[in-house]
């Protein structure tokens, strides 16, 4: 018997399942089917591993020393992932799911199930949102908390006074608390800016007097309060809280007095307009759709009454946060990830409004996006072909099966993208905007999944810091080891599951030769100093490319200078193909 449930009702109930089915391959491959990659992941893995070993889990630790840049929620969860599955990125599956479904729920409240499905696909594939969701860092948990908070804020704002409004705002506070415990102030800033901007825009000042808006603060107090109290009463707790919430927040906007290690204005420099100029890259492959959405939003935000509220909320969830980021002294692209939530909603609203009534700009955006996805698929295929050719120049036995897989994957990438894009073109001819976007998503996601499965093993070899750390650990097992001006990745890789004993030599304000020679005098002829060398080691890819363009070999940096001056000798080198290079220094020959 044919079901009596109307098709629209069926879609409303089933869009979350459809989202999970569509995005699961991207999440599983991007999160679980690769090793730990720089930047940041080796450091985050060591902090999570340390958290899984700690008896006092109040504060994160990097190589046994307090790491006071973020609150501990994401590290608690990653430590649980290590204990349960041996995988610190396992919680990212939950973060990505919460992010996609929360954005979808917001779009469903704005319009319909079709917008919910589309917005979830978009936030799952926008370059910056996808990168953050699959990366081992607190930003993934922050993004999930912000998505949850925005969903609650919209529901609370648009609901009539009573239980539904209370539930919405309570959800907002829950998401804000999760975001705060993941990465401090941005967890509060994103929903607060969106809601306050919307209230001011619509001059609905009475909303600030609603008891429902503040009742959920109890949730935040119950989540954040016990942890902050426990830290405050612990030894050195007040200094830890000052570092977490003064130097790490205010100190990223302006230079404040304090130790040099806490001067965050000295790295990741910001410059005027950085985030807005880089925004087209963050939005790939949907950049042109975002342009069309912004053009339509110009009219949408001027619609009076509830019909214009979705447009105003999407803008309020995006632009104010980017403006605040632009005022900071420090900047990193991942900081802008929460702004992708509002952009996903904006594009979904555009797709609904342009359905069956395309403008010239809409048509150009759809065609241009298909061309962009086709170009990306070609780049993926070219990269896979390059890997297959480069394998022959790695000075290792050729794995013909792996070579064949990469060539076949390159062909499959092109075929899958071409077929899906053809369906997208047909949907546009029928003025089916949502269908065109979904088919384009299929082309992009299919190409990314196929290329990822084939390419990630090669990238894992370039990023195999575990092997590098094992070799260094074995080579220095009976020798005093020092690290010369190490970065956090070096410290983390030697500590992760190995606890390689070492000391840090800091040359700030000193001469490297004086510091290193002093270490050798103090610890004898068997002592060693590890130095990160500049550039990357050669590999099959660089050897292949050097046939067409001369690639100068990287120098030895400070290690070469110390060896030339007779302060030290290079005892051994450690390197990964296309990856990091290290020199192990010993005392100069007698």
Residue locations for each model-derived region?
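Membrane-embedded architecture of ER/inner-membrane glycosylation machinery
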Residues: 2-4, 13, 170, 296-590
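Membrane-integral, polyisoprenol-dependent glycosyltransferases
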Residues: 2-363, 576-581
């Amino acid at each position: 018997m044919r079901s009596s449930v109307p098709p629209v009702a069926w879609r409303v109930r089933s869009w979350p399942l459809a989202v999970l089915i569509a995005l699961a391959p991207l999440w599983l491959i991007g999160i679980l089917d690769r090793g730990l990659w720089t930047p940041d992941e080796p450091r985050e893995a060591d902090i999570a591993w340390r958290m899984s070993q700690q008896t006092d889990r109040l504060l994160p630790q990097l190589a046994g020393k307090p790491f006071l840049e973020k609150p501990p929620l994401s590290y608690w969860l990653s430590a649980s992932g290590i204990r349960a599955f041996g995988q610190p990125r396992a919680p990212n599956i939950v973060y990505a799911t919460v992010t996609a479904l929360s954005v979808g729920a917001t779009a469903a409240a704005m319009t319909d199930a079709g917008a919910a499905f589309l917005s979830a696909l978009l936030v799952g594939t926008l370059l910056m949102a996808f990168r953050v969701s699959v990366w081992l860092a607190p930003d993934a948990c922050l993004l999930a908390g912000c998505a949850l908070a925005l969903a609650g804020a919209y529901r609370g704002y648009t609901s009539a006074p009573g239980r539904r409004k209370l539930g919405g705002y309570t959800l907002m506070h829950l998401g804000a608390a999760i975001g705060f415990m993941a990465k401090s102030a941005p967890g509060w800033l994103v929903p607060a800016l969106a809601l306050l901007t919307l209230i001011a825009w619509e001059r609905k000042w009475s909303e600030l007097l609603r008891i429902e808006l503040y009742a959920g603060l109890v949730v935040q107090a119950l989540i954040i309060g016990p942890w902050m109290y426990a830290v405050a009463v612990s030894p050195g707790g007040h200094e830890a809280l000052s570092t977490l919430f003064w130097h790490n927040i205010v100190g990223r906007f302006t230079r404040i007095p304090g130790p040099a290690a806490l001067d965050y204005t000295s790295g990741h420099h910001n410059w005027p307009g950085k985030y807005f100029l880089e925004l087209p890259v963050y939005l790939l492959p949907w950049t042109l759709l975002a342009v069309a959405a912004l053009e339509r939003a110009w009219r949408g935000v001027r619609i009076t009454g509830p019909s214009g509220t979705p447009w105003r909320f999407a803008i309020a969830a995006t632009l104010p946060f980017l403006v605040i980021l632009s005022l900071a002294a420090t900047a990193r692209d991942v900081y802008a990830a929460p702004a992708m939530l509002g952009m996903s909603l904006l594009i979904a609203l555009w797709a609904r409004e342009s359905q069956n009534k395309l403008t010239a700009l809409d048509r150009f955006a759809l065609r241009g996006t298909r061309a962009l996805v086709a170009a990306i698929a070609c780049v993926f295929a070219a990269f896979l072909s390059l890997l297959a050719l480069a394998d022959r120049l790695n000075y290792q036995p050729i794995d013909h099966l792996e070579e064949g897989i990469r060539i076949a994957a390159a062909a499959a990438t092109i075929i899958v993208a071409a077929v899906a894009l053809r369906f997208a073109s047909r949907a546009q001819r029928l003025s089916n905007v949502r269908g065109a976007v979904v088919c384009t998503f299929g082309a992009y996601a299919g190409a990314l999944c196929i290329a990822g499965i084939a390419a990630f093993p090669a990238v894992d070899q370039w990023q195999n810091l575990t092997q590098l750390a094992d070799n260094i650990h074995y080579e220095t097992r009976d020798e005093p080891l020092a690290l010369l001006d190490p970065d956090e990745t070096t410290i983390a890789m030697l500590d992760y599951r190995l606890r390689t004993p070492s000391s840090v030599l800091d040359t700030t304000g000193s001469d490297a030769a004086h510091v290193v020679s002093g270490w050798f005098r103090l610890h004898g002829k068997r002592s060693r100093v590890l130095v990160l060398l500049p550039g990357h080691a050669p590999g099959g890819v660089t050897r292949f490319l050097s046939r067409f363009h001369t690639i100068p070999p990287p120098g030895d940096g400070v290690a070469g200078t110390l060896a030339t001056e007779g302060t030290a000798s290079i005892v051994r080198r450690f390197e990964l193909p296309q990856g990091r290079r290290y020199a192990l220094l010993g005392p100069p020959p007698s």
